[in-house]
Amino acid sequence: MKILVTGTSGLIGYNLVERLLKDGHEVFGTIHKNNKRVKGVEYFYGDLRDMEFCKEITEGMDVVVNCSANTSNAVDTVKSPLVHVTPNVIVNTQLIEASYFSGVAQYVFISSSTVYPPSGDKLVDETWNIFEEPYPVYHAVGWMKRYGEVLCDLYSNQLSPSMDCIVVRPGNCYGPHDKWDFDKCHVTPATI
């Protein structure tokens, strides 16, 4: 299977391409800086905010996994909550559109647990109301990720022909290939 993974220098993307290669898939990745690379991945160098680049890289792919995200650290999310909204909305919108018009069979969107509202003492399941406000600290990021999920619903349930879309909402991930520098890392690595 030909699989494109965006965000291959990040924690989830890097580990995912390693696994996909191990499973025998033909793996392609995107890179926008001189970031770390995985041997065996064919890389496209460019900017996912460029629609022509998105069209070029999705052409001929069976699956596109969007692990890319304009991120920094938890402190930035609190101090400058809008810093990541516009770049991520542009990338998410263009990548799913390019995937659809390129005939990609399956699109996987890596969302975030920031979409959930505060739950207090109750457990949250899939029946929660998506229009409840996200946790206040992650309000901007939560709504931005929710918009990506709404796009997935549009392309998989509202259009004909449709494109199979999967939404994954990881929690506070950490592990090999994560950012461990306190000034750049997310909450979990910062506490370790």
PLM-predicted stretches and their roles:
Residues V115-P117, H139-A140, M163-T188:
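Flexible, glycine-rich beta-alpha linker
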